[in-house]
């Protein structure tokens, strides 16, 4: 077995063989000594919403799924599940591949991204694949897994919209993360349990009365802040697109 092996005893059984499309979570793996813990988020907004698969160190780890789905786990306004799961890897450098597979096979048909990331032992990471074509990049974000205080939830914001200089994130009409550039990560912030409101993104410095690039949830629906969760808000898509798969959007990832 390769030295950069993936700990897939549960994943192969539960993640590939028995899962339906976009239901790709493996059983959670233990935080073993000398492992690193990872989730990968497909946030590359193509005009066509391809069915894709992920490989790590040339080993397929998912069945077919679509934009914007995390693996493993899920979130709000994403594919996937409602769980904050990660998978375990041997620490060090690992190769990540996102590709459109040949129909009915594990081989790659259209390569969307391949590149290396370096991950340390004993830590948790979310790896976001952002932008498209030759500009696709892996944005590696370390995770703080400390449980928040009772009656609070801890957030951070990751900006994955390439064609805006920087973004301000709002919740319930208030700026909670300011001037975050593409691939930037905000400082963590705390919101009180049961607070209700909508998320919105605007170009950095824009007045709060200007039209938002995106709002979540849509319409008059609010999100109510849960208790003692760890979540990442991330923006995706492209500014100026008004229809289809590439419109600006807000998603929340369970960490």
Whereabouts are the PLM-identified features?
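Intrinsically disordered, low-complexity polar regions and short flexible loop motifs
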Residues: 19-255
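Sec-dependent bacterial lipoprotein signal peptides
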Residues: 1-19
């Amino acid at each position: 077995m390769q030295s950069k092996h993936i700990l897939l005893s549960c994943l192969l059984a539960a993640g590939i063989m028995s899962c339906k499309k976009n239901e790709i979570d493996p059983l959670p793996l233990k935080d073993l000594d000398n492992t690193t813990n990872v989730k990968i988020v497909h946030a590359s907004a193509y005009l066509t919403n391809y069915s894709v698969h992920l490989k790590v160190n040339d080993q397929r780890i998912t069945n077919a799924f679509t934009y914007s789905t995390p693996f493993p786990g899920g979130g709000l306004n994403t594919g996937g599940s409602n769980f904050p799961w990660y998978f375990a890897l041997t620490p060090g450098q690992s190769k990540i591949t996102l590709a459109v597979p040949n129909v009915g096979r594990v081989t790659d048909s259209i390569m969307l991204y391949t590149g290396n990331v370096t991950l340390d032992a004993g830590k948790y990471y979310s790896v976001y694949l952002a932008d498209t074509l030759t500009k696709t990049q892996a944005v590696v974000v370390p995770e703080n897994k400390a449980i928040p205080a009772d009656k609070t939830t801890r957030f951070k914001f990751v900006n994955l919209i390439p064609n805006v200089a920087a973004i301000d994130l709002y919740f319930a009409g208030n700026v909670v993360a300011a001037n975050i550039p593409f691939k930037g990560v905000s400082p963590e912030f705390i919101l009180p349990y049961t607070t209700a409101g909508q998320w919105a993104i605007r170009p950095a410095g824009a007045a709060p009365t200007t039209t938002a690039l995106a709002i979540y949830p849509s319409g008059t629906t609010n999100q109510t802040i849960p208790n003692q969760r760890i979540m990442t808000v991330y923006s995706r898509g492209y500014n100026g697109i008004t229809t289809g798969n590439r419109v600006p959007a807000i998603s929340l990832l369970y960490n």
